[in-house]
């Protein structure tokens, strides 16, 4: 019998065995024997737990039926069986902060081996301790204020305007795809000095797209599956990185290297001893942080603004004011860092988009020891899922939380919606190193979008919470060019 046929018949049995093992893990009740007081909740089905209900598609601007029902029934902190493990789910902003601010002391990242295999075992998402801090420092240096001001700002504007010049009026196109082009080109230029349209850049883009599909796929390492293709794409990316590193080292020795530390690869070769696999894992992490999340946020802001013309008018007024002031001073039209810092309402729009869009809805952690919080015990070894979206959509924190209201951020410091309740990309040791880059990309995109276009939805499309927010149709839009003075 052919191996493929054997696998076909064995797969249902293997799946049942895997689910059974996961179910047994999820059924851990040793806490009862130890007299611990865990939060109320339900462990769901004996085998599957409540994972399917937890991951059921829902609008990314809501918590979803599962979370809403459980919070109403059990409170903001409850227990469940998710992803094959007993889990504490937190919709409580205080517990969320407590977990994130005690990373590595009381809690640690909790990813299955299948996820680590695809992300890379030296990925910042997986690493802990000194190596995590070292990789994080490289990322912060790469996406720090100095490079944002001197490199990313100008490159962002260049790639955004180049993309906009290709837009045709009244012809539908997917906004998500256009946002991805801009953010990907920006990152690979600053990481590897690859320019848009170059064969290596296009090859890397296709490999990365295959890689990302596997990150959110069922982890079946079988021929033809998205997960298997992602593993293969990662291996090809690492070979590509190794080749680029060797070429750069040869050029440096020959005195023909004209790039130096202008990109991340040059900086790594000069300032660290990372090997090709470590740099590849860093690259994939930075592409996710500086490309994937930024492209999603840009698409969300286009979506939200379409239903809020008052905000679009306010943005145009702000950006026209900056353009006219630059003209009056005789300055060139290219944006400066000072121009960017003046875009205060644009920052409010970004903050509101990240709050309502919930790009990172939750994270996975595991208790390293027994932890007590608000009268409850979190047993050692249990998973903990802080749900950031819960605070972002809490009516006791944000008035009318389902409404897109950028103006709320003009007075946010005086209300109940303190910055402590705002965690679009986490907090603490493992917060996103690319948050400021993402904000800048969105603001520069808004500057040129609102000054040059009106837009409308070509067909209905709404963001759903997959592993990350996404639009089933890619958010098809049509644009009309403006001639603002």
Curated annotation (Swiss-Prot):
What use does biotechnology make of this protein?
The coexpression of CYP90G4 and CYP94D108 in the yeast strain RH6829, which was engineered to accumulate cholesterol, leads to the production of diosgenin, the main precursor for the industrial production of steroid hormones.
Q: Name one GO molecular function term.
A: heme binding
What intrachain disulfides are recorded? none
Q: What biological-process GO terms show up in the record?
A: brassinosteroid biosynthetic process; brassinosteroid homeostasis; cholesterol metabolic process; saponin biosynthetic process; steroid biosynthetic process
The record lists the membrane-crossing segments as 4-24
Which InterPro entries does this one have? Answer: Cyt_P450, Cyt_P450_CS, Cyt_P450_E_grp-I, Cyt_P450_sf
Bilayer disposition of the protein: Single-pass membrane protein
Q: Which reaction does it catalyse?
A: cholesterol + 2 reduced [NADPH--hemoprotein reductase] + 2 O2 = (16S,22S)-dihydroxycholesterol + 2 oxidized [NADPH--hemoprotein reductase] + 2 H2O + 2 H(+)
According to its UniProt record, in which pathway does this protein act? Steroid metabolism; cholesterol metabolism
Indicate the enzyme's highest-level EC class. Answer: oxidoreductase
Where along the chain is heme bound?
432
Q: In which tissues is it expressed?
A: Mainly expressed in leaves and, at low levels, in roots and stems.
Keyword list (alphabetical) reads: Cholesterol metabolism, Heme, Iron, Lipid biosynthesis, Lipid metabolism, Membrane, Metal-binding, Monooxygenase, Oxidoreductase, Steroid biosynthesis, Steroid metabolism, Sterol metabolism, Transmembrane, Transmembrane helix
Write the Enzyme Commission number(s) for this entry: 1.14.14.-
UniProt-annotated location(s): Membrane
User: Which Gene Ontology cellular component terms are annotated?
Assistant: membrane
**Protein function:** Involved in the biosynthesis of spiroketal steroid and saponin natural products from cholesterol such as diosgenin and analogs (e.g. furostanol and spirostanol), plant defense compounds used as main precursors for the industrial production of steroid hormones. During the 5,6-spiroketalization of cholesterol, catalyzes the hydroxylation of cholesterol to form 16S,22S-dihydroxycholesterol and, possibly, the subsequent conversion of 16S,22S-dihydroxycholesterol into 16-oxo-22-hydroxy-cholesterol and 16-hydroxy-22-oxo-cholesterol.
Q: Tell me its family.
A: Belongs to the cytochrome P450 family.
Protein name per the record: Cholesterol 16,22-dihydroxylase CYP90G4
Record organism: Paris polyphylla
